[in-house]
Amino acid sequence: MLRLSDIYSAASAVRGKYSGGTIMSYTVTPIGYVRSCFKEKFAIPRQPLLAPAAQGCIELLPPYDQADAIAGLEDISHIWVIFLFHKTLEDTPRLKVRPPRLGGNKSIGVFASRATHRPNGIGQSAVRLERAEPGRLWISGIDLLDGTPVLDIKPYVPYADSLSMAHNAIADSAPTLITVSWQPNALQQAEQHAQRLQQPLIELIEQCLAQDPRPAYQQPTPERMYGVQFYDVQVRWRYLTLEQIEVIEVCLA
């Protein structure tokens, strides 16, 4: 039987070991990489499942590209993807961050946010598993940059992972969406590229831009143009007001 005194003694020993400068370190090896509709960080939804039309796949590396590694996934609708924020790795630790949800000006502790600047650069996202085949997992509702290294995959377990009693005063509900409108020629361009790509491009653009991707501290004017690449197309838009975006152009990147 494990006694509390044993736990306290062990904790003291660990503190003593760390205070002496001996800290455990380890390396991780990706099990695969994400192939995503998002080619740059800007305009990626700040949480998973906010843009159901955002699709991609996880390309698994050997030995995890074999059928044995995915056996049973056919009975699972959603998975947790554990990944590396490979574009925001830093040598200097950040103790406080400025989350967009608080306007980009207020700081909170790094452990109270899901900011990409993490102590070990590790992130996790719950995404929908569309289908699985040896070497590839097709997923949607993603918030993952193309080329993201995947460290692990775990099944989403509804009774354990959905906590009805949980609360978060900082982000207790999904952000308010803003209106997305189209110039006629831009909508026609998007329809043509959607047909060529065989992807829900119009829905992707609307769902991502409705999240208001601009930095929270910016006060855009109608003259200022924004742009981002989805798949192989460049999308350009402007803010008619702080609550309305107008898509101007959708063209090959």
What do the predicted segments below correspond to?
Residues 25-30, 117-126, 231:
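Short coil-to-beta-strand transition motifs
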Residues 1-20:
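N-terminal amphipathic/basic-hydrophobic helices that include classical n-h-c signal peptides
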Residues 132-158, 250-253:
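Short solvent-exposed strand/turn elements
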Residues 4, 8, 23-67, 73-75, ...:
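Arg/Lys-rich, positively charged N-terminal/basic patches that mediate binding to nucleic acids
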Residues 240-253:
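Enriched for short, Lys/Arg-rich terminal
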Residues 35, 127-130:
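Conserved positions in beta-strands of structured domains
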Residues 69-123, 211, 217-221:
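Active-site-adjacent substructure of cysteine-protease-like catalytic cores
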Residues 202-228:
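A conserved acidic, glycine/proline-rich C-terminal tail/linker
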